[in-house]
């Protein structure tokens, strides 16, 4: 795939406006056009690790005539708290931020989740633009309009559906990404392959080592294909009334692991274990063939993602899953596969089957 800019449309549903996801290199020149002439002020929310990037972006926007401020927040999941959100609200209030002004969220998935949540809640909703800088945030967090913060009770339990006005995926940002962060994001890419686009799996399996680096020949295509999977789903189901649930493949157990680890595990690592579990659950429930279940193990292992978690933590994980957003009443709900690219819901599975599936994951 060439380095030309790819534009992916995300359709407006549930009263939201349609928007574009741009994928390419050197895209920040597009930012002013997305912000528009109506905005007087722009707030750049960025993590501590991207302080230089955030300040450079603020300076560039100021040079374009905007009253630009940079709001620095903690790195990774430590940013997704009510206290950090309140810190951002205070900064917006002190700068006189109005409904015509714009928030720009720069960084990984946690940063864009927070920026979107702050935008959703300030003055009951202001426009925001996502500038994701990791694989995870490009293919997942920044697309689709889910915003949120974590609480002691679980991950993303407080949040809002508030789609961005646009998303800029500048692939140059991936060049300096630590390898573990890059590989973590591949979990969401692989998920897209299993639930909707098997060509993604073929590209990775052809050269797993090349898939582990942004310099790989298929990096742009893998990211574009993954974004298109999510864009198609959320365009028809913004608020997770039905189809969008398939994007939670691997996430029920994954989120439970993240909570159990107090959000010190990378999201992609937890989702990788969650997909391995979901594949075994689908197999044991008589839904998924052996070859596709085994393919989960081989492709995740080939790119260096984890397959296992501590067996003795199963009771805690079950309790965590009971407060998962996807649960209905007292019934646990899992996304499983009836076959490759055939996701479906498995509701209230037998606890013995769940334990047996976890037996393949636990160590």
UniProtKB/Swiss-Prot annotation:
<dbReference type="InterPro" id="IPR030960">
    <property type="entry name" value="DHQS/DOIS_N"/>
</dbReference>
<dbReference type="GO" id="GO:0005737">
    <property type="term" value="C:cytoplasm"/>
</dbReference>
<keyword id="KW-0479">Metal-binding</keyword>
<dbReference type="GO" id="GO:0009423">
    <property type="term" value="P:chorismate biosynthetic process"/>
</dbReference>
<dbReference type="InterPro" id="IPR050071">
    <property type="entry name" value="Dehydroquinate_synthase"/>
</dbReference>
<keyword id="KW-0963">Cytoplasm</keyword>
<dbReference type="GO" id="GO:0008652">
    <property type="term" value="P:amino acid biosynthetic process"/>
</dbReference>
<feature type="binding site">
    <location>
        <position position="267"/>
    </location>
    <ligand>
        <name>Zn(2+)</name>
    </ligand>
</feature>
<dbReference type="InterPro" id="IPR056179">
    <property type="entry name" value="DHQS_C"/>
</dbReference>
<keyword id="KW-0520">NAD</keyword>
<feature type="binding site">
    <location>
        <begin position="109"/>
        <end position="113"/>
    </location>
    <ligand>
        <name>NAD(+)</name>
    </ligand>
</feature>
<keyword id="KW-0547">Nucleotide-binding</keyword>
<protein>
    <recommendedName>
        <fullName>3-dehydroquinate synthase</fullName>
        <ecNumber>4.2.3.4</ecNumber>
    </recommendedName>
</protein>
<keyword id="KW-0170">Cobalt</keyword>
<dbReference type="GO" id="GO:0009073">
    <property type="term" value="P:aromatic amino acid family biosynthetic process"/>
</dbReference>
<keyword id="KW-0028">Amino-acid biosynthesis</keyword>
<dbReference type="GO" id="GO:0046872">
    <property type="term" value="F:metal ion binding"/>
</dbReference>
<keyword id="KW-0862">Zinc</keyword>
<dbReference type="InterPro" id="IPR030963">
    <property type="entry name" value="DHQ_synth_fam"/>
</dbReference>
<feature type="binding site">
    <location>
        <position position="155"/>
    </location>
    <ligand>
        <name>NAD(+)</name>
    </ligand>
</feature>
<dbReference type="Pfam" id="PF24621">
    <property type="entry name" value="DHQS_C"/>
</dbReference>
<feature type="binding site">
    <location>
        <begin position="133"/>
        <end position="134"/>
    </location>
    <ligand>
        <name>NAD(+)</name>
    </ligand>
</feature>
<comment type="similarity">
    <text>Belongs to the sugar phosphate cyclases superfamily. Dehydroquinate synthase family.</text>
</comment>
<dbReference type="InterPro" id="IPR016037">
    <property type="entry name" value="DHQ_synth_AroB"/>
</dbReference>
<dbReference type="GO" id="GO:0000166">
    <property type="term" value="F:nucleotide binding"/>
</dbReference>
<feature type="binding site">
    <location>
        <position position="146"/>
    </location>
    <ligand>
        <name>NAD(+)</name>
    </ligand>
</feature>
<feature type="binding site">
    <location>
        <position position="188"/>
    </location>
    <ligand>
        <name>Zn(2+)</name>
    </ligand>
</feature>
<feature type="binding site">
    <location>
        <position position="251"/>
    </location>
    <ligand>
        <name>Zn(2+)</name>
    </ligand>
</feature>
<comment type="pathway">
    <text>Metabolic intermediate biosynthesis; chorismate biosynthesis; chorismate from D-erythrose 4-phosphate and phosphoenolpyruvate: step 2/7.</text>
</comment>
<comment type="function">
    <text>Catalyzes the conversion of 3-deoxy-D-arabino-heptulosonate 7-phosphate (DAHP) to dehydroquinate (DHQ).</text>
</comment>
<dbReference type="GO" id="GO:0003856">
    <property type="term" value="F:3-dehydroquinate synthase activity"/>
</dbReference>
<keyword id="KW-0456">Lyase</keyword>
<keyword id="KW-0057">Aromatic amino acid biosynthesis</keyword>
<dbReference type="Pfam" id="PF01761">
    <property type="entry name" value="DHQ_synthase"/>
</dbReference>
């Amino acid at each position: 795939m060439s380095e030309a800019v790819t534009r992916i449309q995300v359709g407006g549903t549930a009263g939201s406006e349609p928007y574009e996801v741009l994928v390419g290199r050197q895209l920040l020149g597009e930012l002013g056009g997305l912000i528009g002439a109506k905005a007087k002020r722009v707030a750049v929310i960025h993590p501590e690790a991207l302080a230089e990037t955030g300040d450079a972006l603020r300076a560039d926007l100021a040079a374009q005539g905007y009253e630009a401020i940079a709001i620095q927040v903690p790195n990774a999941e430590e940013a997704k708290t009510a206290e950090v959100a309140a810190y951002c609200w205070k900064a917006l209030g002190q700068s006189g931020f109005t409904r015509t002004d714009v928030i720009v969220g720069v960084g990984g998935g946690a940063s864009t989740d927070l920026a979107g949540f702050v935008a959703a809640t300030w003055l009951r909703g202001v426009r925001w633009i996502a500038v994701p800088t990791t694989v995870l945030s490009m293919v997942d967090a920044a697309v689709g309009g889910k915003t949120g913060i974590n609480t002691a009770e679980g991950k993303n339990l407080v949040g809002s559906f508030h789609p961005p006005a646009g998303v800029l995926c500048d692939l140059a940002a991936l060049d300096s990404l630590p390898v573990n962060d890059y590989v973590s994001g591949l979990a969401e890419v692989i998920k897209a392959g299993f639930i909707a686009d098997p060509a993604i799996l073929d590209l990775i399996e052809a050269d797993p080592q090349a898939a582990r680096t942004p310099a790989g020949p298929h990096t742009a295509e893998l990211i574009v294909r993954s974004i298109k999977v999510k864009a198609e789903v959320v365009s028809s189901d913004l608020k997770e009334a039905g189809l969008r649930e398939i994007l939670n493949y691997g996430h029920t157990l994954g989120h439970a692991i993240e909570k159990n680890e107090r959000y010190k595990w990378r999201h992609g690592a937890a989702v990788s274990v969650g997909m391995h579990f979901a594949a075994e659950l689908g197999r044991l429930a008589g839904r998924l063939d052996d070859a596709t279940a085994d393919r989960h193990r081989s492709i995740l292992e080939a790119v260096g993602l984890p397959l296992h978690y501590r067996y003795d933590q199963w009771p805690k994980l079950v309790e965590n899953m009971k407060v998962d957003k996807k649960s209905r009443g007292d019934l646990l709900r899992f996304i499983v596969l009836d076959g490759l690219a055939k996701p479906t819901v498995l509701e209230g599975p037998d606890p013995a089957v769940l334990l047996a599936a976890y037996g393949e994951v636990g160590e």
